[in-house]
């Protein structure tokens, strides 16, 4: 029997407001434990929450960017459960009247585009953070308690781990572009739980789902789903039954491990939050927020293709993060050829960032210096090979590319007389290669070009070297 995989994702995104969702405590990552809390965060008796307007507007902005309908009336509810990182014994969330519904995003996998529905987006507060010491007790840091979150719940439209990965990449890009969150998984500002079930191919009835947690990277989401699909398939093929449960992805073994039998919504005993009034969102407020949404990845990608003639793949890679897209546009605005700028960012810059595990803002390279270097290539001052030496200096130390070229003596040799002399010396030293080229072996010319470049320490103008070699060989 063949099975179809059915996946839905629940993504929690921390909003980068200045203060928390229901209190005036600062909302910032990395402070010493329990230094960014107050009596509201800690649930002291008699205290009352006050809703953060910016958190609401950030949630609206994200929901609109994800094509959601924004509620005219929405409310908050208490989700009741006990856990050491939840001092009130309930979480303020939204249950039956979420802020946003019926959204979608478009993904592309293996050249095929597909819309993934978004069931709902709602606002809630984050819990504190537990650290298990391993010697019999746990530490609780309440700095995160009360941080504003949006939970983005997808429709069960995802049919493979690859589609799940593409959905998360696209979702992250859109949220980052809106500016409401930095979406740093390593800091917990973007977290994902996955629901997965199998059903017979062709069936429209959902199977019993399993929820996966501890998915701390997009790759772990993909690996966790791949393992869980195989685990469930094995059980079903052997005549077994899938239980509704929550499982944890084990990063060491790349398997999923049982955490607990899955709770239903009735276990949380939701009821309306009595300390917060109904929230009304009129059309004027909606339009004001909508007007603040910047150009999003798909629109930017289309513009790069139409205005600058970039290949679709280049445009897609460049717009994957707002930081890279902004850097690219600033480089072009400073006079760099768009295609050359694209190539340098996609190959050399991205390669350096990946190797060094850094972000664009961590390096000394600026759009102005990259554009300056590219213009030196364009006007023939340096070759692409020499440019790599300049690039290394710019990335690590910054500076003016023109000044670096002069100080290090890297100016490309374009003097025809000087190069012709070197070409003649190379031809005299390699008569066999000359004969090979005359006999139709084109690779011999490449060897001779390499010898000239070696003699000039990479500073000869390659097109001019080619031209002179062909001319001089023709005379022999």
Swiss-Prot record:
It comes from the Bacteria. It catalyses: L-glutamyl-tRNA(Gln) + L-glutamine + ATP + H2O = L-glutaminyl-tRNA(Gln) + L-glutamate + ADP + phosphate + H(+); L-aspartyl-tRNA(Asn) + L-glutamine + ATP + H2O = L-asparaginyl-tRNA(Asn) + L-glutamate + ADP + phosphate + 2 H(+). It is an enzyme of class 6 (ligase). SMART domains: GatB_Yqey (SM00845). Disulfide bonds: none annotated. It holds the Pfam family GatB_Yqey. Its EC number is 6.3.5.-. GO terms for biological process: glutaminyl-tRNAGln biosynthesis via transamidation; translation. GO terms for molecular function: asparaginyl-tRNA synthase (glutamine-hydrolyzing) activity; ATP binding; glutaminyl-tRNA synthase (glutamine-hydrolyzing) activity. Keywords: ATP-binding, Ligase, Nucleotide-binding, Protein biosynthesis. Allows the formation of correctly charged Asn-tRNA(Asn) or Gln-tRNA(Gln) through the transamidation of misacylated Asp-tRNA(Asn) or Glu-tRNA(Gln) in organisms which lack either or both of asparaginyl-tRNA or glutaminyl-tRNA synthetases. The reaction takes place in the presence of glutamine and ATP through an activated phospho-Asp-tRNA(Asn) or phospho-Glu-tRNA(Gln). HAMAP family: GatB (MF_00121). Heterotrimer of A, B and C subunits. Belongs to the GatB/GatE family. GatB subfamily. This is Aspartyl/glutamyl-tRNA(Asn/Gln) amidotransferase subunit B. It comes from Geobacillus kaustophilus (strain HTA426).
């Amino acid at each position: 029997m063949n099975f179809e995989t059915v996946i839905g994702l629940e993504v929690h995104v921390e909003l980068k407001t200045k203060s928390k969702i229901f209190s005036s405590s600062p909302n910032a990552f990395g402070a010493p434990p329990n230094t960014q809390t107050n009596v509201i965060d800690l649930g002291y008796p008699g205290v009352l929450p006050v809703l953060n307007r910016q958190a609401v507007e950030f949630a609206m902005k994200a929901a609109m960017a994800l094509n959601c309908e924004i509620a005219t009336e929405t409310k908050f509810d208490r989700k009741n459960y006990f856990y050491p990182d939840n001092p009130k014994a309930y979480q303020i969330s939204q249950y039956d009247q979420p802020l946003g519904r019926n959204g979608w995003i478009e993904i592309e996998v293996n050249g095929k585009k597909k819309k993934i529905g978004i069931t709902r987006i709602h606002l809630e507060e984050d819990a504190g953070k537990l650290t298990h010491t391993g010697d019999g007790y746990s530490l609780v840091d309440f700095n995160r308690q009360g941080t504003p979150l949006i939970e983005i719940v997808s429709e069960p439209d995802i049919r493979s781990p690859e589609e799940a990965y593409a959905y998360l990449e696209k979702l992250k890009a859109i949220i980052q572009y809106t500016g409401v969150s930095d979406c740093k998984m390593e800091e917990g500002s973007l977290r994902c739980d996955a629901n997965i079930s199998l059903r017979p191919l062709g069936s429209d009835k959902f199977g019993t789902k399993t929820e996966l947690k501890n998915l701390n990277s997009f790759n772990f989401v993909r690996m966790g789903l791949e393992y869980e699909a195989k685990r469930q398939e094995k059980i079903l093929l052997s005549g077994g039954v899938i239980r509704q449960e929550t499982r944890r992805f084990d990063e060491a073994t790349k398997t999923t491990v049982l955490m607990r039998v899955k709770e239903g919504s009735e276990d949380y005993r939701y009821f309306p939050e009595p300390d917060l009034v109904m929230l009304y969102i009129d059309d004027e407020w909606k339009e004001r927020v909508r007007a603040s949404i910047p150009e999003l990845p798909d629109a930017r990608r289309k513009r790069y293709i139409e205005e600058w003639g970039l290949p679709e793949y280049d445009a897609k890679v460049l717009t994957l993060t707002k930081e890279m897209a902004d850097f690219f546009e600033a480089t072009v605005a400073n006079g760099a050829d768009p295609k050359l700028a694209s190539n340098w960012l996609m190959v050399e810059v991205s390669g350096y960032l990946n190797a060094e595990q850094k972000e664009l803002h961590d390096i000394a390279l600026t759009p102005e210096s990259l554009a300056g270097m590219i213009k030196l290539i364009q006007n023939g001052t340096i070759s692409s090979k020499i440019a790599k030496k300049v690039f290394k200096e710019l990335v690590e130390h910054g500076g003016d590319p023109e000044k670096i070229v002069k100080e290090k003596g890297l100016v490309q040799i374009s003097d025809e007389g000087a190069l012709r002399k070197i070409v003649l010396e190379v031809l005299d030293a390699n008569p066999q290669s000359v004969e090979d080229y005359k006999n139709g072996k084109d690779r011999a010319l490449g060897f001779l070009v390499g010898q000239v470049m070696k003699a000039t320490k990479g500073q000869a103008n390659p097109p001019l070297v080619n031209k002179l070699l062909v001319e001089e060989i023709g005379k022999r």
